[in-house]
Amino acid sequence: MSAPHDGYGQFPPQQPTEQPPYPDQGYANPADAPPPAAGAPHAADHGKKKKRAYAAGAFDVAAGGNAAVGGQVQGGGQFGAPAPGYGGYPQPEAQPATYGAQPAAYGAQPQQPYGMPAPAPAVGYQAPEPYYPSAGAPPVPGDVAGLASGMSAMNLGPGAHQQPQQVPAQGRVGPLNQLYPTDLLNQPFNVSELDLPPPPIILPPNSSVTPSPDANCLPKYVRSTVNAIPTTHSLLKKSKLPLALIIQPYAALHDLDDPVPVVQDQVISRCRRCRSYINPFVTFLDHGHRWRCNMCNLTNDVPQAFDWDAAAQKTVDRWQRHELNHAVVEFVAPQEYMVRPPQPLVYLFLFDVSYAAVSTGLLATSARTILDSLNRIPNADRRTRLGFIAVDSSLHYFSVPKDSDENGETSMLVVSDLDEPFLPVPQELLVPLTECRNSIENFLTKLPEMFANNQNNGSCMGSALRAGHKLISPLGGKIVVLSASLPNVGYGKLEMREDKKLLGTSKENGLLQTANSFYKSFAVECSKNQVSIDMFLFSSQYQDVASLSNLPRYTGGQTWFYPGWNAGRPEDAIKFASEFSDFLSSEIGLEAVLRVRATTGLRMSTFYGNFFNRSSDLCAFPAFPRDQCYVVEVAIDENLTKNVVCLQTAVLHTTCNGERRIRVMTLALPTTTNLADVYASADQCAITTYYSHKAVEKALGSGLDSARDMLQSKVTELLQTFRKELAGGSMGGGLQFPSNLRGLPALFLGLIKHVGLRKSAQIPSDLRSAALCMLSTLPLPLLMQYIYPRLYSLHDMPDNAGYPDPETSQIVLPPPLNLSSERFVPFGLYLIDDGQTQFLWVGRDAVPQLLVDVFGVTDRAQLRVGKGALPELDNDFNERVRAVALKSRDHKAKGVGSIIVPHLYIVREDGEPSLKLWAQTLLVEDRADQGMSYQQWMGTLREKVST
């Protein structure tokens, strides 16, 4: 019998006080509390309290798990009422909230600093004059659209012969970010803080040549670990904070999803000495005929064509040029930027056709997905080429005829000599997609049948890679490996070395390192010839991901791992097909190099990511992916004398449509001599990303223990430094830290307890190695979720959650909860999502009506647990739950490109123990396996800091 709709449970009414409260925070003033999370309704919005279904009885909206972060505050106050701003910063009226007045780089809703009203649109620097008119000139409107009339009044419009002398940037007016210490023990971290934008970048007035709101780089492209740069190496060293850039040049898989301004006229003005590109932070001199480089101070001539439109044969308004208004621009490169004609897009597929690959359905699913994705593979210039090699203990080449060849049949050529595999007919092995479309379709349709009865267990993948490299190295391109077995014959032969007795011991470290030097040396050789490798690995047995992942690591590729994959499970087949199709459709760059230049005194010292470091400051990418980020550590070699420093990232690449381009991203940051300014401007998410890369490097070099110890010692060092230098040395029984870094201990704990790094005797080395690949490549928003997953309470969602927001049309998510079992109630329904896997947790006392509405069953025993999908039922709550689960995996809303489609696992609290345990390992703040709880962690840190 279903329960009536005004209170679905058959239990006595649930009192709000009976639910596990947020750990006592001891806020004397509600203003000191953490902010409401994205999408959380303000207390005042509740009006009359609505009764919720699905609880053990009816209860208030503000009760339950979500009340802790987004509900009403006792006494009628609101979180952050007379609020300090970001992490406690009060925001002066003239002070910008964040670069470019954009919402947080990720998060479902634009986030304001804690409890503050929406600020006026910011422009990336403080209170600029609308323009810099010469004496007696009329003022100019502040918006870019209004510049034209003002320019003509100053004789600066089209046809003007003189540019004005630019007024130099003035000395800093007003303070940088204020430092607001907080007690980590009494005012603990709240997960919603991870959605806040970084501390604002506050530049002196007139720092940029135009008042464009896009003059400074958005954090989704480039973030600094500190948004105020110490002027000396000694001050940076004293702070113990890292100085590094987190760089994600592309925020989407396709240009249409994240367009940037393109300079088409091929007029590229660069500094003669340091080769920086002209940008919004240069200075014009000599009536606009010359410009001073903001990196090295050299004076350069402005190109004559800078103010001339060659196509229209008329002068143009320089102040409208993209490179003076936008921190992120893309230049179409002229001939001198090309060593050879732009390479075409080339995909060479290496299919594992051994018994393991055929029996799991990998070969059939791969071939079908490529067939279905032929229209998605970029081919606008009609030069894209494809090639196919099948691999077991021999190499099977396929010569695909052109469609115009009437009697053409795809022929297979088998080569068994693995020592020096020759190329039978190279010109027919890489064929143009446009000219051979029908033949390729026929071949892919027949391919699974050719090997349907193959019993061969051999895999000569190393030899296949050498043959593939030989085939495509004259052109360059991508080798895509689809393998379900360990390479066990020929070059790069690997042994089964997994030993469960070694897991969790110091000897485990050897399993994470390469077993055969072939993989690194071959990868470097590939990089030199513009060959990139992507690995799609599917084995249910040991596959040595540690060794194979070297191939993508040094060639700008990625390792995708599907443990225990089988096409017989629809969820497995759908996930891979979706991800592989998006992978093929991605508008990658080719033959790319990345370089970061900076103001004199700064030097790029260390680079992290999947590429080959060709020289001290040049990173080489045979292919440039759109779903990875890179970390560059910055050293201060000389004292910085300027108020503002700039760091400019340039990516020279060939688009997959055959155009040579340079993407330039310029970030301007203020300098300071004050340690408090450095701490107040520190970005906890960027710092965590930097240390994630450092921890992976440490794990692969010195072992997992060293990586975990390094993370603990670093966070301890920061707490000690803050106590000694900025908290007066006194702790008063608490643990002082800046409010903008309040999440750092929780994020570091998440890293230490992550599947890639945690101490455990239960984690297969392949799983660990794949996790380390993710920890060192994921874009920052996805990395934060991977380290500290999202937890949503669904049974008591706010009334607007799961519906589109009226203004943005985006699905509203419930406020996220901290990762602790204290958040859970036995009758609850929760979503846990780390970006790779989603768990739908069903409480042991979930009421029948909840089960009916969400799953279409009346009894928990009927619930199909494990990997699955939510049924589509014709009721409002089912639609909302599905909408939340789908929105939680929305990469575009987070400002990133990604192909990942997380699996969904349905977990019953009283169901299968192993599944329940796996889900619980994501509850970072709980004690699990050999990892400590958040309370124990904070106690440990306090002891270390006070000794």
UniProtKB/Swiss-Prot annotation:
Pro residues bias (residue ranges)? 13-23
Cellular compartment(s): Cytoplasm; Cytoplasmic vesicle, COPII-coated vesicle membrane; Endoplasmic reticulum membrane; Golgi apparatus membrane
Q: Which CDD domains match?
A: Sec24-like
- Name the source organism: Chaetomium globosum (strain ATCC 6205 / CBS 148.51 / DSM 1962 / NBRC 6347 / NRRL 1970)
Write one Pfam family the protein is assigned to. zf-Sec23_Sec24
Q: Which UniProt keywords apply?
A: Cytoplasm, Cytoplasmic vesicle, Endoplasmic reticulum, ER-Golgi transport, Golgi apparatus, Membrane, Metal-binding, Protein transport, Transport, Zinc
Q: Which InterPro entries match?
A: ADF-H/Gelsolin-like_dom_sf, Gelsolin-like_dom, Gelsolin-like_dom_sf, Sec23/24_helical_dom, Sec23/24_helical_dom_sf, Sec23/24_trunk_dom, Sec23_24_beta_S, SEC23_SEC24_subfamily
* Record function comment: Component of the coat protein complex II (COPII) which promotes the formation of transport vesicles from the endoplasmic reticulum (ER). The coat has two main functions, the physical deformation of the endoplasmic reticulum membrane into vesicles and the selection of cargo molecules.
Molecular-function GO term, any one? SNARE binding
Segments of this protein annotated with the region Disordered: 1-51
Q: What is this protein called?
A: Protein transport protein SEC24
Share what the entry says about its subunit structure, partners included: The COPII coat is composed of at least 5 proteins: the SEC23/24 complex, the SEC13/31 complex, and the protein SAR1. Golgi apparatus membrane; Peripheral membrane protein; Cytoplasmic side.
Major location category of this protein: cytoplasm
Q: Which family does it belong to?
A: Belongs to the SEC23/SEC24 family. SEC24 subfamily.
Name a biological process GO annotation: COPII-coated vesicle cargo loading
- Region spans: Zinc finger-like: 271-296
